[in-house]
């Protein structure tokens, strides 16, 4: 009986995040490359997901989305106010501002949408507002709480990636 209560309590504690779009790997290291997946666990009620649009935070300059078989991929760019040095001597003049996957994901299935990116040198919370469009309806996962520790309290929180300080002697690869 106690095991059942403990399991039920654990399930209840995790319930608020069950329906949110989340990063499968919720932490990365400042100044390093991060490859992770945004997990979409349901549609809009019984309606299939047909598009996922993810906004990329301004501090992230290098992003490469992962293509998905059967889905189309669109990448939106925004010019930088001032060019910055990039990898291998290149100059970065624009950044990826949004990634949009279009396809079909039945409401009773889940999938993951991959992003590889160079994280900023500063630690802290990065939010990736996402709009999940369905055959009927949509979910706007765009709420950014004033306090990252209160993320789970938001009804429709933007996916969050926590950037941890770089380890001493860390070199980005």
Feature annotation, model-predicted:
Residues 33-69:
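Low-complexity, serine/threonine/proline/glycine-rich extracellular segments that form mucin-like
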Residues 30, 133-173:
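Extracytoplasmic/periplasmic copper-protein system
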Residues 96-124:
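Low-complexity, intrinsically disordered segments enriched in Ser/Thr together with acidic residues
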Residues 31-36, 111, 125-127:
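Short, solvent-exposed loop/turn segments enriched in Ser/Thr/Gly
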Residues 18-40:
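N-terminal edge beta-strand
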Residues 60-94, 159-168:
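A surface/secretory-pathway sequence property marking extracellular, secreted
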């Amino acid at each position: 009986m106690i095991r059942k209560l403990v399991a039920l309590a654990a399930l209840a504690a995790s319930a608020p995040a069950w329906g949110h779009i989340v990063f499968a790997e919720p932490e990365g290291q400042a100044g390093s490359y991060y490859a992770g997946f945004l997990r979409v666990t349901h549609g809009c009620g019984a309606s299939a997901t047909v598009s996922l649009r993810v906004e990329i935070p301004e501090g992230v300059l290098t992003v490469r989305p992962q293509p998905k078989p059967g889905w189309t991929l669109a990448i939106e760019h925004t010019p930088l106010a001032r060019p910055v040095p990039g990898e291998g001597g290149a100059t970065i003049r624009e950044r990826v501002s949004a990634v949009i996957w279009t396809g079909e994901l039945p409401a009773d299935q889940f999938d993951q949408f991959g992003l590889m990116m160079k994280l900023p040198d500063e630690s802290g919370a990065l939010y990736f507002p996402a709009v999940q469009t369905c055959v009927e309806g949509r979910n706007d996962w765009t709420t950014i709480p004033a306090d990252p520790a209160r993320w789970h309290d938001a009804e429709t929180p933007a996916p969050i990636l926590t950037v941890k300080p770089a380890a001493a002697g860390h070199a980005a690869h």
